[in-house]
Amino acid sequence: MSERLILGENAIYTMNGEINDNILVIGGSGSGKTMSLAEPYLLETYASSIVVTAVKRRIIEQYAPLLRSRGYDVLDLDLAHPDRSDVTYDPLAYVESTADIAHLASAIIDSDPRKAYSSADPYWDKAATDLLKALIKAVLIRRSIGISAGATFADVLWLFDELSFDDKGGGRISTSLDGFFEQLAWSDTDGCAKRWFSSFSNLPIRTAGCVYSQLATLLSEAFTQELRNMMQNSSRALDLTQLANQKTALFITISPIVSAHRVFANLLYSQLFKALFELNGSRPLPVPVKILCDDMAAGGGIHGLPRILSVIREKGISVMALLQSEGQLNECYGHSAQSIFDNCDSLVYLGGMDVRTAQHISQRLNTGLEDVLWMPVGREYIFRRGQRPVKTVRYNIQSNSLYQQLLRNYKVSQEVYGCDTLRDN
């Protein structure tokens, strides 16, 4: 069955048409983004793999049975309770080359939610990235020569935990890992580990302290002990390429209040996009992949997302991103936010209290600002490239017979199995 795109009442479109299938959904809290757009997106998933970030367990519990009935392998990555996940994720599992190392380190630094508000010298980011690259490279070298055969990203974090430094005079530093990297040089054939580490160890003491403090805060918050434990469990390791080769639904559950989960999820997304792009040459993926990302700009940026959105169509990848306001995206991605808007051929506005967003919507509509700000709850504007804007009522999913059946089944399961039907059933 072909997949449809339900954007509103009597606003149903076909996927894979003349325009791209990237969709931005903007609406304030409680505007109906999940029920009127995200859940219909799931209902209409028949042939594509899908990755869903959600803050409510209800989403996976309600839709997993439906997707399994359609032949999907449903994977549950619960970052709020990693020990309960049926798959695990280790960022180091997708690192082989120097380019992979650079990508992972940059993705971690870019995922810092404080970057939007920071006035720190951009050089600090480069120095922190080089330090992280050095630690990743060191762990990979040790793994390749058999010292740490089962090394994971948790080993990279452990190595950082071991790092300390003192003033050796003249404003320069000596570190607790100087000897470690000297010994490693025998196996560091391209010299990258030593060179990257030297960019940190040669810093003045005050600058080194700032770089170290910035990176320590990010790593301690983004990689909780529970997530470190999960990364060390390789028996249920997630294979990101599976999404491109068979119908798969990956649900990523995050806490609505723990920013570390969003940072970790954004890191996964950055590696997912890279892994999918490297498959099948320049040809489309065997199985199209849809990404449904709730509150996409709420926890730091996804590394390279503006550029990624401009080219993912050729691979058969599409994104539905849910936001509360345009300002949220601007804070996260800065000037690159405009590129994200430009590469989403569908925009749905459900209303909200953000005046700047309303101003931009009124400009798109060529109408007065008050018409947008005073739009009744339950109404929405739909913008599609090459078409006139549509003002309509948001989709009432509760009138959908399939949704009604899913809801009945979910309620029965709740009564029989308790609070988490997937784990108790």
Task: Please tell me what each predicted stretch does.
Residues E3-N10, T14-I317, C332, Q359, ...:
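P-loop NTPase motor domains
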Residues H81, R394-S401:
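A short, sequence-level motif marking secondary-structure junctions
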Residues V319-L322:
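C-terminal catalytic subdomain
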Residues Q324-Q328:
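Conserved H-loop
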Residues L329-S339:
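Short, glycine/polar-rich helix-capping loops at beta-to-alpha or helix-loop-helix junctions
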Residues L347-D354:
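Conserved AAA+ ATPase "SRH/arginine-finger" region at the nucleotide-binding site
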Residues R356-S362:
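Conserved AAA+ ATPase core "coupling" helix
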